[in-house]
Structures are given as structure tokens and as C-alpha cells.
Amino acid sequence: MSKVASAAGKAIDWASVASKLKLDAATASAIANFRSRHAQAVAKLGTLREQATTVDFATYRSVLANKEIVNRIESSMKSFKPVKIDLNSQLKAINAFEAKASEGAKKNVELVKAELQNLSATLKNIEQARPTEEITIEDMKQAVPEIEKIVETMVTKGKWVIPGYREKFGDLSIM
């Protein structure tokens, strides 16, 4: 991994990525799983690089009585060719994960854009709203026509308290 990529990976606050980007649980857990597998692979690579890769066959010949075994092992090691592994299946899995992550990211982008539009419309409504002191009874009747019938019914029945008001807001009367 390049120094730039390593520095960029260390600069990211991975704990807050999911909450800041509002990722769904599946995407967040997939990222966490990928990060843990990557950390394990980097640790394993570090331990393997620290190990010695050369074998001193002269030492084994001097210690062991059966020198033919040492000669066979040495010839086997010299003729050893590492097996080339076909990485296509793993690359396909990585590409599938990347496609799924991209699709999830696009959905998240659309959700965020829709939420931003909704919030900006709400903010515009709040900024353009009239102060409550300027709202008249006629404005209330026009906005909610059934309020006039409700008030007339309450007045004819002699009810001056809105049902449920005291339970919700408490009794503010002095007496």
C-alpha cells in the first residue's frame, strides 16, 4: 500500500463514518468487517516479512548424520516453484462488493438530497411565515374551516375549555 493511501486511511475517523454518512447497518458492518480483515492481513504480512527466508543447509549437514536427507531437502527447495493462484474469483467478489457498496452509496446520496430539499423548503416556509401576532381569527377560519363549527358548538354548550388541554399543558389558572 502506498504511503499516501496509508496516511489517508489513518486520517479517517472510522468510528464516526457510519453516523456522519448515515449509512445503513449492512453497509456499516461490511465496512467494519473489511477493515478488520485488512488489519489481520497487514499484521500477518508483517510477521511473515520478519521471518528469515534462507536455510543454512551446511549447519544441518554438520549436525545430522544422514546427509542424504539434507541433500534431498535442499534440492527440493531449489526446485520449488510457488503455485500461481487464480485470483479471478476473489477479484469478482471484490468487484461485487464494490458494486453493492456503490449502489448503497448512490441510494444514500439520493436520500440525503431529498432530505436537503425538504429541509430547505421547510426553512423557506419558516422564513416567510407571518409572526403569530399578525394572524387573525379570519385567517384561522380560512386555514381550518371546521374550527368555526367547533367553536360555535363549544359556545352553545357553554364549554370554555378545550378537551385534553389541561392534561397536556397543565392548569395555568390562578384560582
Swiss-Prot record:
The keyword Ion transport applies. It is a peripheral membrane protein. The modification N-acetylserine is found at S2. It holds the Pfam family Mt_ATP-synt_D. One of its GO terms (cellular component) is proton-transporting ATP synthase complex. The keyword Membrane applies. Transmembrane segments: none annotated. GO terms for molecular function: proton transmembrane transporter activity; structural molecule activity. It comes from the Eukaryota. GO terms for biological process: proton motive force-driven ATP synthesis; proton motive force-driven mitochondrial ATP synthesis. It is found in: Mitochondrion inner membrane. Keywords: Acetylation, ATP synthesis, CF(0), Hydrogen ion transport, Ion transport, Membrane, Mitochondrion, Mitochondrion inner membrane, Transport. Its main location: mitochondrion. Belongs to the ATPase d subunit family. Mitochondrial membrane ATP synthase (F(1)F(0) ATP synthase or Complex V) produces ATP from ADP in the presence of a proton gradient across the membrane which is generated by electron transport complexes of the respiratory chain. F-type ATPases consist of two structural domains, F(1) - containing the extramembraneous catalytic core, and F(0) - containing the membrane proton channel, linked together by a central stalk and a peripheral stalk. During catalysis, ATP synthesis in the catalytic domain of F(1) is coupled via a rotary mechanism of the central stalk subunits to proton translocation. This is ATP synthase subunit d, mitochondrial. The gene is atp7.
